[in-house]
């Protein structure tokens, strides 16, 4: 799921997660920055495989906010490994404020970016959440400001 900030990516992903829970699926919600921190800490403590196994028990993982921070090589490799283990086996929702063509800005390496995009998009539904920020629109409305005059 890609799109500008405030277009409903997280809201939609959480809604899908709730629906999956209601149908008996095991769901985990996390942010990409938090996931990367956890992976790096597990790796430094020689407990990476134990941490990775934790993800295998979830039918759906929602990984929110890809694109707000860049990764060093270790983080990119660790994230690639976790996502690769799930590819074509279990469901994963990734939300990002960047389109795929800009993901090399996050990962800093064209080869790993290409591999991650390839694995994530295989048999995937791609959703582009176009539009303006719902949060900004609501804030302006609450302040009595016309959204159209601010964004022009």
Per-segment meaning from a language model:
Residues 9:
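Conserved lysine of the Walker
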Residues 12, 16:
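Hydrophobic positions on the alpha1 helix immediately C-terminal to the Walker A/P-loop
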Residues 17-30, 40:
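Post-Walker A helix-loop "phosphate-sensing" segment adjacent to the P-loop in P-loop NTPases
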